[in-house]
Amino acid sequence: MSKRTFQPSNLKRKRSHGFRARMATAGGRKVLARRRAKGRARLSA
């Protein structure tokens, strides 16, 4: 049996995938731009 690897934490979620984390890097800003262009209702976690 393999262990359950997903241990949810909202703090870790926000820090790695949140809006401010995205805005902090050039690549992250490109991610947001792509999601805006696609018309996503939610841009980030």
UniProtKB/Swiss-Prot annotation:
**Gene Ontology BP, a term:** translation
Q: Which InterPro entries match?
A: Ribosomal_bL34, Ribosomal_bL34_CS
Keyword Ribonucleoprotein applies: yes
Tell me which UniProt keywords the record has, alphabetically. Ribonucleoprotein, Ribosomal protein
Name the segments for region: Disordered: 1-45
Provide any one GO MF term from the record. Answer: structural constituent of ribosome
Q: Where is the composition biased (Polar residues)?
A: 1-10
On the tree of life, the source organism's domain of life is Bacteria
Where are stretches of biased composition, namely Basic residues? 11-20, 31-45
GO CC list: ribonucleoprotein complex; ribosome
PROSITE patterns assigned = RIBOSOMAL_L34
Give the family this protein belongs to, as stated in its UniProt record. Belongs to the bacterial ribosomal protein bL34 family.
Name under which the protein is recorded? Large ribosomal subunit protein bL34
Query: What species is given as this protein's source?
Result: Shewanella oneidensis (strain ATCC 700550 / JCM 31522 / CIP 106686 / LMG 19005 / NCIMB 14063 / MR-1)
